[in-house]
Curated annotation (Swiss-Prot):
Its main location: cytoplasm. The gene is trmFO. It comes from Agrobacterium fabrum (strain C58 / ATCC 33970) (Agrobacterium tumefaciens (strain C58)). InterPro entries: FAD/NAD-bd_sf, MnmG-rel, MnmG-rel_CS, MnmG_N, TrmFO. This is Methylenetetrahydrofolate--tRNA-(uracil-5-)-methyltransferase TrmFO. Its cofactor is FAD. Belongs to the MnmG family. TrmFO subfamily.
Length: 481
């Protein structure tokens, strides 16, 4: 009998999830064939053919593992030997408390690591239908831009309608075209993050009159029309800037243009009415992206409208914004707890196609799918992460934590989800104890302690699940309640 331990597992899709899945499989000692169509067929959003290309922001969001759910999942992925987080750490650029990367260096590093791994074979080809059963165990991680043929095959197999929404891309501009006589460097609340200085963002201030003129221009700007197949809702976590403006004139002041925690270095006594932040986009510091400024405005409109922002009147854009479609399946109905398709258990799904949202979330589900597939190939039962971990919480949401009801008016449907503390199980009663000497303990202080306790529990349980020891960082030790 053939030793199935040494027969390869196939992974379809070389994005963040597929790359992570392939790495986890190979690091488990199982050969893997990674199929990626870019290089043969492109997409509407990708620019090149490297693996794990970042098409939206260059930020993996907060790296604070003490009281931020995203930082917790970063830390858990590091414990699990994540390729994506390792390459992000290696190619990070200053971004306050966030983990942001040089996008080209990052994706090239992922590509090199996989192509040079002795158990990984990268095949550049489009998979146009469901993988044949002869392939055996297969992970489908084709992401938000799944090719039409494969999407149709998945729909035919599942009998479920595919759901789609839009991810929006923010503009990127050249640093030397920014007027620093108006703008200034500062991270919000002067926060120092990994590789940062507390002055990692370029800030563009607006007074009330400038803000209102800008809002009017955003709302009046022509947008790119939708195709018939794109008639689906936006994901609230990635709304185009003009859609946010249409929802209320003050929406942006309480969102990506909020002025809190920022002091104009050129005029410190005058509080800005609104602030546009620019975040470093590459290691050289020559490119900056407009934080939260994803848009569907026409290219001809974007440059004119965004040059209305003080300090950007002569801005030169390396890339203008745009939108692309995102497709995902009804995972709670279709997948089992180890991410297998119930109707075809030889197939697993991973990444954004499962209904998670965000770079690290996609990669983390790829990490789990890869570990599950490798264990199964070696004749072992997949070890599921504890529900108290970030990995376990996200897995639970995808495979059954979502609530739906057929008999309630306006029933809730499965929606993409970022990792957040709302997905974690509650602490045991009595876990939150008022510190000695504190008279009033509620509100923000109590919330911070709760998050710290949930984060600490998650990392402890994750380390135990993986069978590894974890040494807390100095930052985490200082934050321990």
């Amino acid at each position: 009998m053939q030793d199935k331990t040494h027969s390869p597992i196939h992974v379809v899709g070389g994005g963040l999830a597929g790359s992570e899945a392939a790495w986890q499989i190979a690091e488990s000692g199982v050969p893997v064939i990674l199929h990626e169509m870019r290089g043969v067929r492109g997409t509407d959003a990708h620019k090149g053919d490297t693996l794990a290309e970042l098409v939206c922001s260059n930020s993996f969001r907060s790296d604070d593992a003490t009281a931020n759910a995203v930082g917790v999942i970063h830390a858990e992925m590091r414990l699990a030997g994540s390729l994506i987080i390792a390459c992000a750490d290696k190619h990070q650029v200053p971004a306050g408390g966030a983990l942001a990367v040089d996008r080209d260096g990052f994706s090239q590093a992922v590509t090199d690591m996989l192509e040079n791994h002795p158990l990984v074979t990268v095949v550049r080809e489009e998979v146009t239908g469901l993988p044949p059963k002869e392939w055996g165990s297969t992970v489908i991680a084709t992401g938000p831009l799944t090719s039409p043929d494969l999407a149709a095959a998945v729909q035919a197999e599942t009998g479920e309608d595919a759901l789609a929404f839009f991810d929006a891309i923010a503009p990127i501009l050249h640093r030397d075209s920014i007027n620093m006589d108006i703008c200034w460097y500062q991270s919000r609340y002067d926060k120092v993050g990994p590789g940062g200085t507390g002055k990692d963002y370029i800030n563009c201030p607006m007074d009330e009159e400038q803000y209102n003129v800008f809002i009017d221009a955003l709302i009046a700007g022509d947008t790119v029309g939708f195709k018939e197949w794109e008639g689906t809702p936006y994901f609230d976590g990635c709304l185009p800037i003009e859609i946010m403006a249409e929802r209320g004139r003050q929406t942006l002041r309480h969102g990506p243009m909020k002025p809190m925690g920022l002091t104009n270095a050129h005029n410190p006594t005058v509080k800005a009415y609104a602030v546009v932040q620019l975040r470093q986009d590459n290691a050289l510091g020559t490119l900056y992206n407009m934080v939260g400024f994803q848009t569907k405005l026409k290219y001809s409109v974007q440059a004119d409208v965004f040059r209305m922002i003080p300090g950007l009147e002569n801005a030169e854009f390396a890339r203008l914004g745009g939108l692309h479609r995102n497709t995902y399946i009804d995972s709670p109905i279709l997948l089992d707890r180890s991410l297998r398709l119930k109707s075809r258990p030889d197939l697993r799904f991973a990444g954004q196609i499962t209904g998670c949202e965000g770079y690290v979330e996609s990669a983390s589900v790829g990490l789990l799918a890869g570990r599950f597939a490798a264990a199964e190939r070696k004749g072992e039962a997949p070890s599921l992460p504890p529900a108290t971990t970030a990995l376990g919480s996200l897995l639970n949401h995808i495979t059954g934590g979502h609530l739906s009801s057929d008999d309630e008016p306006g029933k809730r449907s499965f929606q993409p989800m970022n990792i957040n503390f709302g997905l974690f199980p509650e602490l045991e009663p009595g876990s939150i104890v008022k510190p000695d000497g504190v008279k009033r303990f509620r509100g923000k202080d109590k919330t911070i302690m709760k998050r710290q306790l949930v984060a600490a529990r998650a990392l402890k349980d994750c380390a135990a699940w993986l069978g590894v020891e974890r040494v807390a960082t100095e930052q985490e030790s200082d934050a321990t309640p």
